[in-house]
Amino acid sequence: MRILPNISRATWFVGIFFVVNILLTACNQPSANSSAEPSPTETNSPVAQVTTDPYKDYKPRLNGKATVEMMVNGQPIIIEVDGENAPITAGNFVDLVEQGFYNGLTFHRVVDGFVAQGGDPKGDGTGGYVDKNTQRPRNIPLEIKVDPAVENAPETPVYSRALGNQAGFPVMLPHKTGAVAMARSQMPDSASSQFYFTLSDETGFLDGDYAVFGYVTQGMDVVLKIKQGDKIQSAKVITGQNNLEK
């Protein structure tokens, strides 16, 4: 699962549609036809069609916020995980942290000034979490919370649907320096364990297509020094454990 090929930063803005489509590359599932640009019927009011929460009983989920301490190169990175606006995405991450899943995994992809991506047990961008009890992969739905200021914005997140930045709908958890989000394949509901830190404010074109679930609150200097191959020495939940519902 890769969110960006080896292209220079200068090429990111050679057409947003082109770039976002490059971001959607296959992981451990076959590719599917997908476009980050909404169709004419979707552009008018894609969020108005959401009336119920199809994932209200999904677990694990984070009901509120939690704080995670991640150690990289001997230094701490503190992440505030937001289950208020991304309960399923945040719950998945916190659950994996509690299991010790990320300990020892590498950052297999780092693009200076853009993202540092890790969380793949295979270390090559093709892996994800497999439940130890069921021996089945866990994939979570794409989860985007639209800003309530938007007309007809639903109270719950929009699931399984890439809205795309081009739709013009501001999101509650935007991409900016220090955002933490899930990587995925071309399939909207393919995120598993791979996540990325954004290294620049010039990443807003990912809003609506990738699910941000938290932000770095301390240790951004550590994040900016991450190199490809660096390991997550440890990750632990230091506050908000009781907000995780399994």
From Swiss-Prot:
Pfam family, one: Pro_isomerase
PPIase cyclophilin-type domain location: 64-246
Protein name: Probable peptidyl-prolyl cis-trans isomerase sll0227
GO cellular component, one term: outer membrane-bounded periplasmic space
Disordered: annotated segments: 31-55
Signal sequence, renumbered to the chain: 1-36
GO biological process: protein folding
SUPFAM superfamilies with a match to the protein in the record: Cyclophilin-like
Enzyme Commission no: 5.2.1.8
SS bonds (residue pairs): none
Homology family: Belongs to the cyclophilin-type PPIase family.
UniProt biased composition (Polar residues): 31-52
